[in-house]
């Protein structure tokens, strides 16, 4: 159990124990705190007592905006749903089985953080508190009478490539699909538990905070995402600047890009007991000034790129007790420092553990790496600077190619001498 471990400060900070609150009864009087704007095509909920789709339906009485399609709680939403600051909204099994959000486009965004002239699909925009429990939420294309499909993509390319964005992507725009976005100013949590979240998000070309990835947290500290099936989104999960979240016991698969992507200053997050597979890029990637992240006891396989990646100044974080197999790279550490990688089992990768782009002060120990087709442990040094002062010990490298020193490889060898402890076990 986590409470029994003796951890360094940054590991202890990352381990959080939380429980979700049970669903509460619907708000008996909501007509004054639910409004519809015909220009932005937005339902705004400002009720401070817990409110649900039934309350919205009773207040608006307009099936062109929100229609209940079956007695057991299948709803079709043709509007933005905006949860105001201080408001509390629940989408749960009290009155909902499946919320289908139309893939039609709103006239403009209702969110101040998005250009008001932008034409974007309907979405859920959270400035208050949202609870999603034991339901299904998807896009829905009323023309095809099926889930909305998008075909956009972004491809990482070397800096300076013609047509690339400033941060090195070639962008192929996708057909717009609805998404869920928790805003920077959210006054409460957005907890998602025991639900299916699918077929949301698209490639909008934005490198900032449009939130079109599918499931996006720019606020909502202390939120929990637990026990869900998250699939066929553009990004399975994306966050920026949030803290104290727990992502656990989810199955995350078939997302067009990353599976789980804590980003840009996300910190004090726990990612544990998830199954992450068959995503279009890394299974779990933490990138750009993320810290105090604990990634443990996850199973990752068949992702298009690495199972786990520490990227662009991720620091004081841990990946431990993960089972990773059939990936190009098991674990990549890139431009990241002072992390711990231990007790992971990596099978059938091309590269087991791969250190690139000036990563220093990392400790990699007690990992089992089996059947690497190229290198068990690979340490590269490039023009930006070397990988220095990393510590490797008690790693087991089993059945890696014999022509590269039983799976250990460094470029150049002088850098490798400073990183490798002689207690690695080679077979």
Range-by-range predicted roles:
Residues 3-16:
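Sec-dependent signal peptide cleavage junction
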